[in-house]
């Protein structure tokens, strides 16, 4: 809804006429490229648990907490599946912007018409104040779309009105879009940069992460899996995990589902990986 008012004078009396106009929402509720959240329905607990440890994990958790206190834009870098979206949600939940909406725009799913509306429609959420907007997978945008976004950010002073968070996949670090966005964010907007390490570089945290996920799947699936055989854990540790935490959760869910013994065997792990 949009409110308009104008002042009228009739028979020496002053009146204020208020018009309420109903216009179509910019986005549909089932649009996968655009989602609206608030502090109660953002999904950040998995990230907080998976990065709440020692070494690199503990430092990441501390950095997120400090970044949340700032008003500066944030650039989140990491491979596919490292939890960039959940990191953005956690920054939002711990920030002073948490009582306003959190707008998540998946740039890999957004259509050209929708993108044009976001940057030009008067009802666009990008015109709001004190909200948080998260451009996920921004490296999926075309160079033309990126240029339009940069122009919009500058002309509307978006970073003075809202909290801007952008994520890039380092799997695409050799693409022009990645370098263009990173340069703009770091050099032009003086953003804060959060680097999420891949799972293969977090060997010290691996057993703790798997124990956490095993417990969750035991509860949700009604199982009582204690852990892994020695050889099975060695197999898990030696695997490269190209899709990182997302892949680990998927694999563990399958392992818990098909395992009938207290410990997951090496043969079972080999069958799934």
What is each PLM-predicted segment?
Residues 2-11, 198:
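A short, hydrophobic, proline-anchored segment that marks a local hinge/packing element in signaling
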Residues 111, 176-218, 246:
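Conserved AAA+ ATPase core "coupling" helix
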Residues 38-176, 199, 218, 222-261:
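AAA+ ATPase active-site-proximal loops
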Residues 1-2, 15, 102:
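Beta-strand residues that line the small-molecule/cofactor-binding core
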Residues 188, 192, 255-259, 272:
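ABC-type ATPase nucleotide-binding domain
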Residues 211, 262-273:
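Short, flexible helix-to-coil linker/hinge segments that flank and couple to helix-turn-helix
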Residues 8-57:
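Sensory coupling linkers of modular signal transduction proteins
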């Amino acid at each position: 809804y949009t409110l308009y008012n104008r002042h009228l004078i009739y028979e020496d009396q002053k009146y204020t006429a208020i018009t309420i106009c109903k216009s179509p929402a910019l986005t549909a509720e089932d649009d996968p490229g655009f989602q609206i959240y608030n502090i109660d329905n953002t999904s950040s607990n998995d990230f907080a648990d998976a990065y709440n440890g020692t070494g690199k994990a503990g430092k990441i958790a501390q950095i997120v907490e400090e970044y949340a206190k700032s008003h500066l834009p944030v650039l989140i870098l990491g491979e596919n599946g490292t939890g960039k979206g959940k990191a953005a949600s956690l920054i939002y939940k711990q920030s002073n912007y948490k009582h306003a909406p959190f707008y998540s725009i998946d740039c890999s799913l957004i259509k050209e018409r929708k993108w044009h509306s976001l940057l030009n429609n008067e009802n666009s959420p990008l015109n709001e104040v004190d909200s948080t907007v998260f451009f996920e997978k921004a490296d999926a945008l075309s160079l033309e779309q990126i240029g339009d976004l940069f122009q919009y950010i500058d002309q509307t002073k978006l970073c003075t009105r809202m909290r801007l968070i952008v994520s890039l996949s380092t799997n695409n670090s050799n693409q022009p879009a990645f370098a263009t966005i990173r340069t703009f964010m770091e050099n032009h907007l003086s953003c804060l940069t959060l680097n999420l390490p891949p799972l293969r570089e977090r060997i010290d945290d691996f057993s703790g992460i798997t124990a956490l996920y095993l417990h969750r799947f035991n509860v949700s699936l009604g199982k009582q899996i204690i852990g892994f055989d020695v050889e099975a854990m060695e197999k898990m540790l030696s695997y490269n995990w190209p899709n990182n935490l997302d892949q680990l959760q998927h694999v563990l869910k399958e392992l818990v589902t098909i395992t009938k013994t207290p410990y997951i065997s090496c043969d079972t792990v080999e069958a799934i990986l």
